[in-house]
């Protein structure tokens, strides 16, 4: 995957460089090229496929011709001589130039080549003057906002000169003489042109210029970068503005307006901030122009522009940028715009104004920010544009007054209040709605295949790497993992580049300042969110209706989108969409979208972007989370619709684009797994059965899917009322019931990918995750895993139901819900089906195990069949999924997770509990004790709080030594539930490692440990209550009431809130704690010790990425601590970890061994290592230095004794091991010897046979030539060859008498032959007896030898041993033949 990415990056880079060398406008070429490229839908990873040959006229006819086998050729891109281009180029007959191109390309090339800004300036002037003079076209080089012909061009400080060839066309009515170049001077000012960017940034910029980075609207914009660092929402390079993308798809804008600066420092040419105007009107441009226009987010069509503006403005709003801020003429004053028509001028002006409004300044930094925000500003511009149009296009307005949308109640940035934002959003929404009718056209217009294609920039090489889906997902997980910290710099969209990072920080500041309010409201919901919600309220009716974005709309949108991305097959689309969903910080802003995804199309569209911005704050995150929950989950119309629409929350959004079809699999799963999203558990069960190869592929092979939740938990199959519209079934908020989601401070948004979504189809779990789980392990797998684990259905959110349900560590993926904890853990579906032995035999995949786990505890429906009421109310958990409660969650969520969560009433919000982590405070979470067997676990470990991995924890499946144990954060955040995290056995869960059968481990609670419901729900260990913030072990005691937990009411035994790891607290920008939301940031709610379910955790880490243990492991646990941990878990963990503060101390203690702790408690002055390791003399000397009490001395001696014993034991074990190894070696040697001897024997056998066969062949050969006295061939049956001692060979007749066998005859012959010698006569073989009755005489065949017969040594006739065979046959004629044969 990486290689593919790099390869792609290299190709693009080479192409960009080649184009640069050719001084050809890469925007044009790449534009055309990009439009022809698509993610490979048939290969591994994302590979570009030439969907079409170069964009030629023929492309128009067969736009999707697949040139997959052919690599793009520059010749294809450079159609200078292609006459068709001339016709296409804005109707400029012989013109080979694209309708417009970026003059800065040339400048850039010159500048880069010469490094002399002056040269660049000259070149620029040259180009400008030449083009202006030659064509008389309107090449507007505007700087500073000085009015140009259109009065609306703003120069880009970076010198983006967009030359519109169409405008240059003499026939172009709009062409106007070049305006004074005073602006050019500004534009060309060396400082502006100086490369103040790193090479990497420059490369990015170049790529952007080449349109190589089609980030402009990538749905993946907010995906975390490869290094796991969240990109800033407008992250320069990855800024695929979802706002724009989604907006465009929703029809909000035909072109992806949210442009992403390649670098924070480099405005993207397509940014509206640096507007490139299409020179020719749409009509003139023809398809290609439209193509380019859309690519650049520009379209002459006024409606289109208005829509774009609205969309962009919305995106801007979403981003949290106040459109009020003057987009600063200063910002992009330097941008050179060559615009030929009024509309474009207006757009430019609007953009300019927006730049001013956004407070962009001309200085490089400002420009960088501006470019970064340009997408936002663009959005603002868009919305302002219509207004702008209404106003005089005089730039002065924008500059002097800081143009403000009339619709939007403009306030100064400082005063931009939630009300202002709300109104702005409303205005934007209105604009969009007004433009909805145009959306269809816009969608048609959207032809940039690259829109929404995610790429990342290699931090090391600066290469642009197209992200493979897996990578995206990982990134998403990373996002989810991205700390929800208050500091926005951790914004999920944080760029990997320093500039981006800086920008993010600025942005965070900006967000706060711009919004003029703390991102987090007291509730923990960002004010913006509140504003959004207010707006949502306004929009709710629409939301409820699904308004303009209905599933059908979504489908239409999908269909209308021409981008190859959207030409993908359904599965691919689904996968992309889901991926997008996960990628987009899932929490699309909570705003209005909850009710209807489209509530603010822009919001969703920009959900990622704007999320990053608007909700940078934790509150924002929370809001997003909520919004996302609603938008994603609830946002969709109903679950089915919601799924399709909700996620996207914008019809156009990628999410919406996903087919509303039944559940989604995580996007990643969409393609690879058949959808198990059946809404009904039974169906899933069927699916499960289908995929149930004991699990390796449990459901598509959890292991296979492990990286991804089966469904977005957010999309839990059950819809929960979206927050926005409680009534709306919108899937249960990803975090919990949508109903409370809105009201309650959203739990911290789940990791961007919605922990809930990932974790649990039932968001409830996800909810929990989200809360604590903003971070997943960096790798997707971890996230998924954690999601799976997270979602054991048993999140609190799952509500008590989940609680009742066995704690379902697993994601509902397979077992869609453990709905009831009532059932004995072992009662689970799988358990029912298989005996323990069978399970043992099974390949317990994590997924399978999880299934088992789920099933075991409750509903036999691993699949989430409702085993108990749980399903029925769908309270938050699998039940929601299965049991056909499409909205089970919603029901729960709406009702607050009402329903008997497996018999325990989940307080309102119980479902939501998880969802909102019980933000609603639904106590219902108490769900059955069963739910958390963990509770018993907790009790056992007592540590829920102190997440000291008990030995069992680490040793257990994973050997807690593993670094993973110590670094839960490595792959996952506190919520990382990947298998690897030992924390999965959070201390609480960390029950002594029961020698459970592995399968039990996986899927089940340890039967030994607890009966699922055996513990009273209220029995959570006290420690459990204490939150161990450090690990989120979702150890919920069954009794923990989710609500208590949510509020940090760890006090409530039932609180199921995951304990966040300390880290987590830092991350909860979502304000878990900050918001004071039900979940205290700490979720003090007890992290209830993980249940065995947690355990389910899967002590096997095989399928998950390392560190993805189902529970996050404590951040830094040393193995030593194992012992200490045990102790800690027993005691301190319970108390200390319960409180966040306690957690930190616990963490410290976790690393301490029991002896260390005791020594510390007794204030022993000698360190434990010294006590153990010092030589006796030195040790005694040290002891003598201190006045130690008897207790201290006793402890010191004990410590030393234990330490020495430990060493001795280790040595003993080592010796034993050495002996074993030695014996093993000896045994191996013996075996080897035996093998060798056998081989030798076999070889000898084979040789013997070979020789025997060879001799037999010789014997036969000789007989063929022998003749009897009559000249007849001798038959071996009648004659035998005998060899004498001297080597002579005799042919002797065999005795035929019955009494004698050949051997006897031969023997007799020998004896007789030995008789005598008859001169010249062959001795008569009288002795031969009657055997030789033939009277045949043995012929002495040795020629030349004396007639005396030598004594013959007779050999068996076959003469097998004979080496020399001399045979002489005496022919009747007395002729002698002597034959010597040697083997």
From Swiss-Prot:
One of its GO terms (biological process) is regulation of bicoid mRNA localization. Residues 1197-1234 are annotated as: Basic motif. Keywords: Activator, Developmental protein, DNA-binding, Nucleus, Transcription, Transcription regulation. Embryonic expression of isoform B is localized to the mandibular segment and the hypopharyngeal and labral primordia first detectable in late blastoderm stages. Embryonic expression of isoforms B and C is ubiquitous. The keyword Transcription regulation applies. PROSITE patterns: BZIP, BZIP_BASIC. Its main location: nucleus. Residues 588-616 have a biased composition (Basic residues). Residues 867-878, 935-945, 1128-1146, 1299-1320, 1346-1383 have a biased composition (Low complexity). One of its GO terms (cellular component) is polytene chromosome puff. It is found in: Nucleus. Residues 530-546, 1148-1157 have a biased composition (Basic and acidic residues). Residues 260-281, 978-990 have a biased composition (Polar residues). Residues 1195-1258 form the bZIP domain. Residues 258-286, 376-421, 516-549, 585-626, 717-758, 860-897, 923-1026, 1102-1157, 1297-1383 are annotated as: Disordered. The keyword Nucleus applies. One of its GO terms (molecular function) is DNA-binding transcription factor activity, RNA polymerase II-specific. Residues 1237-1258 are annotated as: Leucine-zipper. Pfam families: bZIP_Maf. Belongs to the bZIP family. CNC subfamily. Plays a role in posterior cephalic patterning. Probable subunit of a heterodimeric regulatory protein involved in the control of head morphogenesis. Isoform B may have a repressive effect on Dfd response elements, thereby modifying the activity and specificity of the Hox system and moving the body anterior/posterior axis. This is Segmentation protein cap'n'collar. The gene is cnc.
């Amino acid at each position: 995957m990486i290689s593919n990415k790099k390869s792609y990056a290299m190709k693009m880079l080479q192409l960009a460089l080649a184009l640069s060398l050719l001084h050809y406008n890469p925007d044009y070429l790449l534009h055309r090229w990009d439009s022809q490229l698509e993610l490979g839908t048939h290969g591994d990873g994302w590979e570009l496929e030439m969907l079409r040959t170069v964009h030629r006229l023929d492309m128009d006819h067969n736009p999707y011709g697949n040139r997959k086998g052919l690599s793009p050729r520059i010749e294809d891109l450079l159609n200078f001589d292609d006459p068709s281009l001339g016709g296409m180029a804005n109707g400029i007959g012989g013109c080979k130039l694209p309708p417009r191109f970026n003059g800065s390309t040339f400048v850039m090339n010159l500048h880069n080549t010469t490094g002399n800004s002056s040269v660049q300036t000259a070149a620029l002037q040259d180009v400008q003057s030449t083009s202006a003079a030659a064509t008389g076209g309107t090449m507007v080089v505007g700087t500073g906002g000085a009015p140009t012909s259109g009065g609306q061009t703003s120069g880009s400080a970076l010198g983006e000169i967009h030359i519109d060839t169409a405008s240059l066309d003499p026939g172009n009515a709009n062409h106007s003489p070049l305006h004074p170049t005073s602006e050019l001077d500004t534009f060309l000012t060396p400082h502006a042109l100086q490369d103040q960017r790193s090479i990497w940034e420059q490369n990015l910029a170049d790529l952007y210029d080449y349109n190589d980075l089609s980030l402009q609207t990538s749905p993946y914009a907010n995906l975390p970068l490869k290094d796991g660092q969240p990109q800033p929402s407008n992250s320069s390079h990855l800024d695929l503005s979802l706002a724009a993308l989604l907006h465009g798809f929703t029809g909000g804008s035909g072109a992806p307006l949210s442009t992403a600066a390649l670098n924070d420092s480099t405005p993207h040419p397509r940014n509206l901030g640096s507007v490139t105007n299409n020179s020719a009107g749409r009509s003139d441009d023809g398809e290609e122009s439209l193509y380019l226009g859309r690519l650049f987010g520009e379209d002459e069509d006024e409606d289109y522009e208005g829509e774009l503006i609205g969309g962009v403005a919305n995106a801007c709003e979403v981003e949290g940028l106040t459109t009020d801020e003057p987009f600063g003429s200063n910002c992009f004053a330097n941008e050179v715009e060559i615009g030929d028509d009024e509309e474009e001028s207006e757009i430019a002006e609007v953009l300019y104004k927006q730049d001013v409004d956004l407070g962009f300044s001309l200085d490089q930094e400002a420009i960088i920010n501006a470019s970064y925000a340009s997408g936002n500003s663009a959005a603002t511009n868009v919305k302002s544009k219509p207004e702008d149009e209404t106003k005089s296009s005089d730039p002065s307005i924008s500059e002097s007054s800081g143009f403000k949308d009339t619709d939007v109640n403009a306030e100064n940035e400082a005063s931009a209040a939630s009300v202002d934002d709300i109104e702005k959003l409303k205005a934007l929404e209105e604009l969009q709605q007004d433009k909805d009718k145009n959306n269809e056209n816009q969608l048609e217009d959207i032809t940039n295949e690259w829109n929404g294609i995610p790429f990342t920039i290699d931090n090391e090489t600066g290469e642009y790497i197209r992200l493979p889906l897996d990578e995206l997902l990982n990134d998403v997980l990373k996002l989810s993992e991205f700390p929800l910290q208050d500091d926005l710099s951790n914004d999920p969209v944080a760029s990997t580049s320093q500039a981006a990072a800086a920008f993010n920080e600025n942005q965070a500041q900006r967000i706060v300042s711009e919004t003029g309010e703390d991102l987090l409201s007291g509730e923990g919901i960002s004010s913006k969110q509140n504003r959004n919600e207010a707006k949502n309220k306004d929009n709710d009716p629409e939301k409820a209706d699904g308004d303009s974005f209905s599933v059908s709309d979504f489908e239409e949108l999908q269909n209308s989108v021409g981008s190859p991305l959207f030409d993908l097959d359904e599965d691919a689309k689904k996968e992309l969409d889901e991926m997008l969903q996960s990628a987009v910080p899932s929490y699309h802003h909570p705003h209005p979208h909850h009710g209807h995804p489209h509530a603010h199309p822009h919001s969703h569209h920009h959900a990622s972007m704007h999320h990053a911005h608007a909700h940078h704050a934790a509150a924002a995150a929370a809001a997003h989370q909520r919004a996302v929950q609603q938008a994603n989950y609830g946002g969709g119309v109903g679950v089915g619709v919601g799924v399709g629409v909700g996620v996207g929350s914008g019809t156009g959004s990628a999410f919406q684009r996903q087919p509303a079809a039944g559940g989604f699999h995580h996007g990643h799963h969409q393609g690879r797994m058949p959808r198990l999203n059946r809404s009904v558990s039974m169906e899933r069960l069927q699916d499960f059965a289908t995929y149930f190869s004991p699990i390796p592929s449990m459901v598509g092979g959890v292991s296979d899917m492990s990286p991804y939740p089966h469904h977005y938990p957010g999309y839990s199959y059950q819809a929960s009322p979206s927050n926005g519209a409680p009534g709306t079934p919108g899937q249960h908020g990803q975090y919990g019931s949508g109903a409370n989601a809105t009201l309650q401070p959203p739990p911290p948004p789940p990791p961007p990918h919605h922990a809930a979504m990932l974790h649990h189809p039932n968001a409830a779990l996800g909810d929990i995750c989200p809360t604590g789980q903003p971070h997943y392990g960096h790798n997707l797998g971890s996230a998924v895993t954690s999601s799976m684990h997270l979602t054991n259905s048993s999140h609190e959110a799952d509500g008590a139901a989940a609680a009742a349900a066995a704690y379902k560590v697993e994601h509902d993926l397979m077992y869609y819900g453990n709905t009831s904890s009532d059932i004995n853990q072992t009662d689970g579906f799988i358990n029912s089906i298989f005996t323990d032995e069978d399970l043992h035999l099974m390949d317990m995949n994590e997924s399978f195990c999880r299934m088992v786990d789920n099933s075991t505890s409750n509903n036999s429906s691993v699949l989430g069949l409702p085993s108990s009421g749980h399903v029925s109310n769908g309270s938050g958990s699998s039940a929601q999924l299965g049991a056909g409660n499409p909205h089970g969650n919603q029901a729960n969520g709406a009702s607050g997770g009402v329903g008997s969560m497996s018999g325990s009433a989940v307080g309102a919000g119980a479902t939501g509990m998880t969802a909102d982590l019980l933000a609603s405070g639904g106590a219902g979470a108490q769900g059955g004790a069963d739910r958390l067997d963990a509770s018993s676990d907790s009790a056992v470990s007592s540590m829920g709080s102190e997440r000291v991995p008990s030995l069992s924890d680490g040793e257990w499946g994973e050997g807690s030594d593993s670094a993973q144990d110590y670094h839960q954060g490595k792959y996952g955040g506190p919520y990382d539930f990947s298998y690897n995290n030992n924390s999965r056995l959070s201390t609480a869960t960390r029950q002594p490692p029961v020698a459970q059968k592995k399968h039990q481990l996986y899927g089940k609670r340890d039967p030994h440990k607890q009966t699922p419901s055996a513990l009273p729900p209220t029995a959570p260990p006290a420690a459990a209550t204490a939150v161990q913030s450090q690990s989120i072990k979702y150890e919920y005691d069954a009794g923990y009431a989710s609500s208590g937990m949510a509020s940090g009411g760890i006090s409530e035994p039932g609180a199921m809130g995951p304990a966040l790891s300390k880290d987590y607290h830092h991350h909860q920008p979502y304000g878990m704690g900050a918001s004071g939301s039900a979940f205290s940031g700490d979720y003090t709610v007890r992290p209830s010790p993980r249940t065995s379910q947690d355990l389910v955790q899967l002590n096997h880490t095989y399928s998950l990425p390392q560190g993805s243990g189902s529970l996050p492991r404590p951040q830094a646990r040393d193995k030593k601590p194992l012992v200490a941990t045990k102790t800690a878990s027993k005691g301190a963990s319970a108390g200390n970890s319960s409180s966040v503060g306690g957690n930190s101390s616990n963490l410290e203690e976790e690393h301490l061994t029991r002896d260390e702790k005791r020594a510390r408690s007794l204030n022993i002055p000698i360190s434990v290592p010294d006590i153990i390791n010092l030589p006796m003399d030195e040790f005694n000397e040290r002891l003598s230095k201190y006045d130690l009490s008897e207790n201290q001395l006793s402890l010191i001696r004990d410590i030393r004794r234990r330490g020495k014993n430990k060493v001795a034991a280790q040595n003993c074990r080592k010796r034993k091991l050495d002996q074993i190894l030695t014996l093993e070696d000896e045994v191996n040697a013996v075996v080897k010897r035996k093998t060798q001897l056998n081989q030798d024997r076999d070889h000898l056998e084979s040789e013997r046979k070979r020789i025997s066969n060879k001799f037999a062949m010789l014997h036969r050969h000789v007989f063929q030539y022998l003749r009897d006295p009559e000249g007849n061939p001798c038959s071996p049956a009648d004659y035998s060859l005998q060899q004498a001692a001297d080597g002579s060979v005799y042919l002797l007749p065999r005795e035929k008498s019955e009494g004698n066998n050949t051997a006897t005859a031969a023997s007799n012959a020998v004896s007789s032959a030995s008789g005598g010698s008859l001169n010249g006569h062959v001795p008569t073989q009288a002795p031969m007896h009657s055997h030789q009755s033939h009277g045949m005489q043995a012929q002495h065949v040795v020629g030349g030898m004396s007639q005396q017969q030598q004594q013959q040594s007779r050999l068996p006739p076959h003469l097998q041993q004979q080496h020399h065979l001399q045979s002489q046959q005496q022919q009747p004629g007395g002729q002698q033949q002597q034959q010597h044969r040697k083997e």
